[in-house]
Amino acid sequence: FAKGARRPNSQFLAAANPFVFGTFALYEGRSSYNLNQVSISHHFVELAGEQPGIYYGYYFLELADYFGQEGIDEKESMNLLYVTVKALLNPNIDNRLVRCIFELRMMAAQGLCPSLFHCVCCERQPVEGEELFFSQQNHGILDKACLGHVNDAKRISAPALYAMQYIVTASLGKLYTFTVTEEVLHELERHIHTYIAANTEKRFKSLEILEIMS
């Protein structure tokens, strides 16, 4: 809680707004943590004028909150949020791609990364040019020999797979430095959005608004 943050002269007034990045010092009360001190390093006030960029931002915050747990170091998630909000303000990258990148990287940060480098069944590393499939139920890629009775496997192209591999391994500083074709973006959306929905137990209100606005 930020006590008195709504007062015009409160030192916490700016810090209580969404999309404010900084260092927050808290003290533990009887039933909650209270804000004691804050040092703001960046205000993303320009995001408020971005449509539908701001709704992407709200969704990213809600998804991060879903995975956040009290007492757990969430530094990686916080830094991911920071570079992601900056990416929303970059006119050279599609917000739809930003969403795909954030969702998959967040899943990886939470230990829910799908198997993208080896067949999830036989653990064999695919060779270049090999036909591969992505299974939501099996949480990763399958080669043709391991399809068996898997009924949800969808073919995944080499560019889409490479993009997903890059997303889960790149440093945060280089995470939003690539683009893809519209065809590959559609494929990433199909695989990643479905994977998120299958591995979370919540219907995100901000996502519902985003889908209406987009």
Model regions and ranges:
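Non-catalytic alpha-helical scaffolds and adjoining flexible linkers that form interface surfaces
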Residues: F1-S214
